[in-house]
Structures are given as structure tokens and as C-alpha cells.
Amino acid sequence: MRLELIIILLISNSLISQNSLFNLEKTNPLDIPIILSGTYGELRSNHFHSGIDVKTKGIQGLSVYSYASGYVSRIKISHGGYGKALYIKHPDGTTTVYAHLKKFSSKIEKIVKSRQYKRESYEIEFFPKENEISVLKNEIIAFSGNT
């Protein structure tokens, strides 16, 4: 009984702390109700999950919105892992990662294509400067995919 109570308290504390960090009512990155497929701190085969994963009901091409204003701090495209991924650094010090994307917004896609042609490679990773690609809260930054 005591062990069950401790486990319940730990789970409750975890949920409360996640709720304060990720109030999905205010920060929904999609235009559909949030259904999580992965949660922060969830045990994976060889690590703890470091984010939340949102289900898209198998739909590709949904608009993906920025959680808050900031700037694109990293873009990585690879055949494995996250596939197309976008990292946005926010003024409060947090970084949000948007992964498994089908494509980026036209503003970002234009810069990505230019870098790909310059490097003659589909797979790229680069770190834009702070003033290079700024985004606003709720700006469309990408479209959902299945990579």
C-alpha cells in the first residue's frame, strides 16, 4: 500500500510538472486535438525520452505552428532519425524541436534548398545565425510528415 502511494505521488508530480512546462491548450503546434504518442521522461530502450511526441492521426501535410517567437537555431535533414527536423530557440531559453516533417514553410524551405544545392547533398545540418531565420508565435513553420 505504501509503495503504491509513493508511485502515485511520483506519477502525479511528474504530470503536474509536465503540465506547467507544456500547457498544450496554449501551445498546440497543430490544428488538431493533442494526442500524445510519447511523453517527456518516458523510458525508452536505451535512454529517457527528452520531449513529447504528438500523433497526427496518420495525416501528412498538417500545418505545424511555432510554440513561441524565436529563431531557427538548427536544421537537420537525414534519411534516418528525425528525418526533417527544425530547432527553434526561444527568448526564455527553451528550444523546441519539430521532427518527422514532410516539408518546411516556404521561407525556411528556400534557405534549405539553397544549402542543399550548395553542398550537393540532400542530407544537411546547419546552424543559422540568430538573426537569419526568425519566427513568430503561431507562425506556420512546417508541415507534418512521417519520416
Which positions does each model-derived feature cover?
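Charged interaction patches that mediate protein-protein contacts
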Residues: 10, 94-97
